[in-house]
Amino acid sequence: YYWYFSGVLTPRFCDDVIAYANEQKEVMARTGGYGDRKLNKQEVLDLKRKRNSDLVWLNDTWIYKELHPYVHKANRNAGWNFDWERSESCQFTKYKLNQYYDWHCDSWDKPYDRKDPNNPEHGRIRKLSMTCQLTDGSEYKGGELEFDFRNYDPHMRDESKHRVQCKEILPKGSIIVFPSFVWHRVKPVTAGTRYSLVVWHLGK
């Protein structure tokens, strides 16, 4: 259910992304139900029970140019052959001490319904998700990426029996690609900082 490339991105590329993103304004990570509106204190607390991290949105050609060949290769080699057309903005994510993202999947039951029908995301759905490891696994502790390949929230039943920890992408510059409907999580970081770059790829 996933395809990985170990250490394929150069350390310079990873460091350039980190440096560039750290110059931008970071925001608190949200889940889909909260939108862009200002949250009250209770909503922030509720959100952080599910997801606690900081992120920066990036939309730069030099990043996509580096990553897209691996998406195409994974899509072909894994035999998924999803028909995807475009990528959303890249999500540069910082997981600092005790930060995490609990079980979730990246796609919804219905395609995006944007107010502007000319929005390139309108009528499209997330088909493939990609995570790029920008820091080496030796630079932090915790922060493990785990999967549950069943088609429902792992909290609902026998979570411990079905989770699969992805150790193949611990080297810096590694990439993992998987269908966006697959449930996954990032466990709490217990030391250091984990930097990653997440991109979703859309199609009809």
Where do the protein language model's features map onto the residues?
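Fe(II)/2-oxoglutarate oxygenase catalytic core
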Residues: Y1-V177, F181-K204
